[in-house]
Structure formats: C-alpha cells, structure tokens
C-alpha cells in the first residue's frame, strides 16, 4: 500500500521528518511538487508561492505503481532530439511517441478555483486531475482508497469514477 500526504510551505519540512519516523525513511518513494499558476498581488514583497508538496510513502516493497496509466506526452524538443534510430542517444530503438513518459516529480495541475466547474468552494479542495493521477498510478479497480481528511469529498468522488472502493472521514462539519 501507499500513503500520500499533502502539505504547503509552512509545515512540509517538519512533516517529512515526522513521516520518516512513522513510516521509515526506507519507505519514502517520492516528494511530488504540485505547482499551479495564480495571479500575484501587484505589491507583494516576495516570490509568488505557487506550489505545494505531496509526500509518497510505501508500506513495503510490494507497493503498486502503474506508470502506463499516467503517461504524458513528451514535449516537441525531446521528440526532435531523441528520434528513433538516432545513434548515441540511448533511445536508438525506442519510439518516444508510443505511450509517452512517466511524469516527473513536479506536476503542473490547475487548482480547483472558485471559477472552475468542479469547485465546491471548499477552501482546501484539490483538483480532480491531481487525485486522478495519484489513484491511477497506485491502485487498480476495486482497490480501496482512503482519505481521512476528505473535506470536499473530491478524492472519494474520483475514486468512485475510477471504480475504486473508498473510505472517507473528516473532523469538519462541512465534510
């Protein structure tokens, strides 16, 4: 099994230490940077904060990862530089157009802003695309997805759409 824990800049450095103690540093898989765009205040005196962190830990070496479910297209420059049959590229017999690539550890995914059709106006709502990538990458149909801070319920809704069983709970009354 896997656990994904989301945080922002205020606690991510502390959270990683706590997660290492709980799950073991040897069970750390990835630190994923979820980046997004939003307008900056015209008078701000610092760089715009436009990313959050998602830590991925595994329960054991028998965790699941399905990269073919989440592949994304290569950019044009990569396709031009690493053409099939190009000697010395390391990709001589590989057609990069087939299937795409496994995403890097930074994901540019738009947040669920108030103006988007999926918003429920819950302050910490995550976009469906973000949760879909995580669920597709690490579960199969009929697997269980749990969200113990489910808030807006987006994780559970995406799990349902992807034919996963789900468990959700939250301390907030809105949830």
Residue ranges and their predicted role:
Residues 1-175:
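Core catalytic lobe of class I
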């Amino acid at each position: 099994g896997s656990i994904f824990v989301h945080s922002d800049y205020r606690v991510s450095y502390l959270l990683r230490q706590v997660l290492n103690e709980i799950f073991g540093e040897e069970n750390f898989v990835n630190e994923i940077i979820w980046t997004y765009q939003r307008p900056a205040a015209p008078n701000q005196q610092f760089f715009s904060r436009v990313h959050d962190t998602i830590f991925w830990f595994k329960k054991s070496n028998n965790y699941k990862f399905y990269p073919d479910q989440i592949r994304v297209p290569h950019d044009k420059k990569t396709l031009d530089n690493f053409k099939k049959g190009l000697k010395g590229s390391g990709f001589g017999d590989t057609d990069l157009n087939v299937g795409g690539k496994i995403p890097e550890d930074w994901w540019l995914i738009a947040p669920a802003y108030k103006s988007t059709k999926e918003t429920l106006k819950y302050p910490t709502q995550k976009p469906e695309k973000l949760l879909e990538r995580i669920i597709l990458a690490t579960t199969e149909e009929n697997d269980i997805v749990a969200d113990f801070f489910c808030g807006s319920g987006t994780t559970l809704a995406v799990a349902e759409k992807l034919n996963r069983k789900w468990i959700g709970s939250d301390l907030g009354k809105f949830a």
